């Protein structure tokens, strides 16, 4: 029964037409309950101070994101008008986590901020780590109570569980290098995160300790996606991995060419879809690890693709375009020219695509 309850909690975000955190929900599967726009048109543009390299979250009628000038923004989803903003002391590359009316986001100043999602006021004083926070936060319930934890890694080599009510540390796990990925949370209470130690760490939330290390052979710049006991991720080893998290040996590895993966994968029932620095998106059979299709752009694809409910796969490229392709075949539906490098990942909800770019703008794309 406990596993069922946790599964329902983790999946709840995926059934709402929102995008409240990195990859849409704690399993980081990159799935949206919204259909992609049929004929893309620009709805609005918001000018931030510096490049927006992480991405946005969408909750209710608002959009949340940070920029490299260190500003956290809340703007209207319908019109792109600023609602509130908060200046931090360094760049903000993380994607906000919106949970129970609070915006949680880390910054390169080493702090995790908890802000009222409506007003922007601080819920509690920022939680301080020993170094910058570039990864986005996730969340889970305390297995022993109804309390909730924000889970986030830092460049101080530590992974933290923080009480959402108080902002106090509940526990932490120390690693041997920088942590730069968002933790993926499995239905049975495991958190998986990677970093510059070339490992995917598996932490038991119940035991509050690391129980396993998965060898990624090189540093892990992005996040894993999990489904059941399976985890999928890429690394600087130029490979994509599929692990059963109960075992330290991979089920399969995929290597196409000698390029790294700085993108987090999206999962369908059959495919793992991930961007690469060979300027392509790769679709890999979940069971066999064999290539199913690739789609070529004219720039690196660090953007993490999003799978929409109508089967569309949406992602950005450093060639300055947003692409929409058929997830089953890789056939292009449409492309939209922004004209500036896109390293950030799309947030998709209510038929709208919200994405940041290196020109300091956030773009909202909808249907004609």
Residues of each region from the PLM?
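Sec-dependent N-terminal signal peptides
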Residues: 3-12
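Short, glycine/acidic-enriched capping/hinge loops at junctions between secondary-structure elements
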Residues: 29-33, 69, 76
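Short loop/turn segments that connect beta-strands within beta-propeller blades
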Residues: 76-79, 116-120, 163-167, 204-208, ...
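Short cationic/low-complexity microdomains
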Residues: 327-347
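Blade/loop signatures of beta-propeller domains
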Residues: 17-43
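Repeat-blade elements of multi-bladed beta-propeller folds
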Residues: 18-24, 49-72, 86-113, 126-160, ...
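A short beta-strand motif characteristic of beta-propeller blades
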Residues: 42-46, 81-86, 121-127, 168-173, ...
């Amino acid at each position: 029964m406990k596993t069922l309850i946790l599964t329902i909690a983790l999946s709840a975000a995926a059934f709402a037409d929102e995008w409240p955190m990195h990859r849409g929900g704690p399993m980081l599967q990159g799935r949206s309950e919204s259909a992609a726009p049929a004929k893309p048109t620009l709805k609005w543009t918001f000018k931030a101070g510096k490049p927006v390299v992480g991405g946005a979250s969408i909750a209710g009628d608002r959009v949340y994101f940070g920029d490299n000038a260190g500003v956290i923004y809340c703007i209207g989803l319908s019109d792109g008008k600023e609602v509130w903003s908060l200046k931090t002391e360094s760049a903000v590359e993380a994607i906000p986590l919106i949970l129970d009316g609070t915006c949680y986001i880390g910054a390169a100043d080493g702090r995790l901020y908890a802000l009222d999602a409506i007003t922007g006021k601080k819920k509690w004083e920022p939680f301080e780590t020993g170094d910058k926070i570039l990864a986005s936060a996730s969340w889970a319930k305390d297995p022993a109570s109804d309390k909730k934890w924000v889970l986030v890694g830092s460049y101080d080599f530590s992974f933290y569980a923080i009480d959402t009510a108080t902002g106090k540390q509940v526990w932490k796990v120390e690693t041997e290098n920088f942590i730069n990925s968002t933790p993926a949370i499995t239905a049975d209470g495991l958190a998986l995160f990677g970093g510059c130690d070339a490992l995917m760490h598996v932490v038991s939330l119940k035991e509050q300790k690391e129980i396993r290390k998965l060898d990624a052979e090189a540093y892990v710049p992005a996040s894993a996606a999990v489904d059941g006991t399976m985890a999928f991720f890429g690394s600087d080893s130029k490979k994509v991995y599929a692990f059963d998290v109960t075992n330290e040996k991979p089920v399969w590895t995929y290597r196409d060419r000698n390029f790294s993966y700085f993108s987090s994968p999206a999962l369908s029932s059959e495919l793992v879809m991930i961007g690469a620095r060979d300027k392509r998106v790769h679709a890999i059979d979940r069971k066999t690890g064999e290539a199913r299709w690739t789609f070529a752009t004219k720039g690196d694809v660090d953007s993490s693709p999003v799978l929409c409910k109508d089967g569309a796969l949406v992602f950005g490229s450093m060639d300055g375009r947003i692409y929409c392709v058929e997830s089953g075949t890789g056939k292009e539906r449409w492309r939209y020219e922004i004209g500036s490098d896109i390293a950030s990942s799309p947030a998709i909800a209510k038929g709208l695509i919200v994405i940041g770019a290196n020109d300091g703008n956030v773009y909202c794309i909808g249907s004609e």
